[in-house]
Structures are given as C-alpha cells and as structure tokens.
Amino acid sequence: MAIQIVLIVGPTASGKSKLAVDVAKEFNGEIISADSMQVYKYMDVGTAKITKEEMQGIPHYLIDIVEPDQEFSVAEYEKRAKEIIKDIYKRGKLPIIVGGTGLYINSIIYIMHFSDFEGSKEFREKMKELANTYGSQYLYEKLKSVDPEAAKKIHPNDIRRIIRALEVYEFTGKPISYYQKMSGMRLNPEYQPIMIGLNFRDRQILYDRINQRVDEMIKNNLVEEVVNLLKIGYNKDSTAMQALGYKEIVEYLKGEISLEEAIEKIKKGTRRYAKRQITWFKGYDFIKWFFVDDYKNYEELKKNIIKYLAGKLNF
C-alpha cells in the first residue's frame, strides 16, 4: 500500500514551518525539511532555520547535516529522505515534508531519472574556476546556450545549480530540463502525496513579509553569522556561501557595497526567488492551494487546512 505523505510547499516567508509543526501535532507526524540551504550547519539566521523552541518537540530531519563547504546533491537528499519516510511510517507516524526547494520535492514524489547521476568533482572544480575568473554570468550564458529552459528557473548567481545543470548536460548529453520533464510523467507509486500550497492573492503582502524577514535577519545578527563562518575558515567560494543572503553580506564585508545596498540586494533577490518558487509549484496539478490572505488570521487558516487534511488522511 502506498505511504501517505503530506507536503507543505510554497514561497519563502509564507509560513510553512509553523504550519508543519501544527499539522504534525494534530496528526501525530514528524517533519522532513525540503530546503536546500537548511541542510548546512552554522547557517541559521540567513536560512530562517526553525529554532528548537519553534519545533515544539516535533522531530525535524535533514536540517544541520552537512558542512558549508560540502556538496549535497539531490540524489543524496532523495536517498536520505526516503529512508526517513520509511522509518516514520514504520513507527505509525505521518511523514510531513516541508520546504520550498522544488527539486527536493520532485525527488520524492516523482521517479527521477537523473537522481543516480554522480557527475564529476573534477568538472565541478573546473567550472568553479571559470566562475572565479570570468564571473557567474559567464557560466549562466553557457547554460543558456545548452539548456535555456533550465536557465529560466535558475538565478544567474546560483553557481551551484548552474554547475549542476551544466554537469548533467556534459555527462549525459541531455539537458537537466529534459530529465525533469521525464520525471514529471511518472509519480512514484510508493507514495500517496497530499500537497498543501501556501500562497497570497495579493503578492505585495508576500513581498512585505519577505522585506520584514530580511530586516529581522539583520537584527538577529546575520552579519555576525557570516563573520563567524569566515573566521571558521569558510570563504566566499564555499558551496553554501553562494546562497542568497550570504554572498551579499560577504560583498559588504569586503567593502564592495554598503550594508544598505546588501540588504536591498537580499530583499530583491528573495522576492525574485519567491516568484520562481510560485511558478514551480503551480506546475503540480494535484496541489491544494490555500491563500493566506483569504483568512482573518492564522488560526482560521490552520483550522481549514487541518479540516481538509482530516478528510484525506487515513490517520
């Protein structure tokens, strides 16, 4: 029998983490993160990582599992997440996957054709050298020429994902977008996914929440977090330091831009990222959208989502 899994997706700053905890409390669940930046240790503020207090005793998995200079592939995520789902299910609990990284979500619910693809560390190092010499835009243009479809979904500064897409093309002869489409045709029969999407009818409300979150990150010592990462020995080329919110602070610390400019760049980049996330999740035809601004308050939103899930789950 297929394992029922609840997936809570949506753009950054939409309230997914809080909702996941409430759903877990209601249905005896445990939570698996699907966030490609929260896998990294020592990066709490800039990734808006859930705190121990906010977890309210609910077990959370795939958070704080790798060093900031380590690579963590979709294949590795898929392997670990599926093992954890099985374990949660065996213990009679509900697996809840929460996050905004579309490829991580896909690796669970679809049969991914490129998930076993390991690639080449040598190739990745070579690409990083090119990026250091000519800038990330150089690699982005390269990707646009071989896989324009994938390039549309990847930010020009997201070196990690640009290199991954180039690597898949280099070693399989087919663009990564081809495999993503292929995977979309076949849902994984091991699971019965029940997907909740959080969104806003008024996009400006989401953008205001993003701006507020970035301001809070600065108040909560994001700059100090980046300084500490650099002190430990991680540099601007470390895998995780390429992330939105970190690379801009590194630019500020190097005197290339002011703090105000760094904050504005983070806000703008995050708003763009949220827009791309919404586009991605709209591609799931089985998603049930809940618009946060349709409800008087969070309690009313939560009540409606729990009612919807109660009608779907065998729990």
UniProtKB/Swiss-Prot annotation:
Keywords: ATP-binding, Magnesium, Nucleotide-binding, Transferase, tRNA processing. Its EC number is 2.5.1.75. ATP binds at G10, P11, T12, A13, S14, G15, K16, S17. GO terms for molecular function: ATP binding; tRNA dimethylallyltransferase activity. Residues 35-38 are annotated as: Interaction with substrate tRNA. It catalyses: adenosine(37) in tRNA + dimethylallyl diphosphate = N(6)-dimethylallyladenosine(37) in tRNA + diphosphate. Substrate binds at T12, A13, S14, G15, K16, S17. The keyword Nucleotide-binding applies. GO terms for biological process: tRNA modification. Its cofactor is Mg(2+). NCBIfam families: miaA. Catalyzes the transfer of a dimethylallyl group onto the adenine at position 37 in tRNAs that read codons beginning with uridine, leading to the formation of N6-(dimethylallyl)adenosine (i(6)A). Monomer. HAMAP family: IPP_trans. This is tRNA dimethylallyltransferase. It comes from Thermoanaerobacter pseudethanolicus (strain ATCC 33223 / 39E).
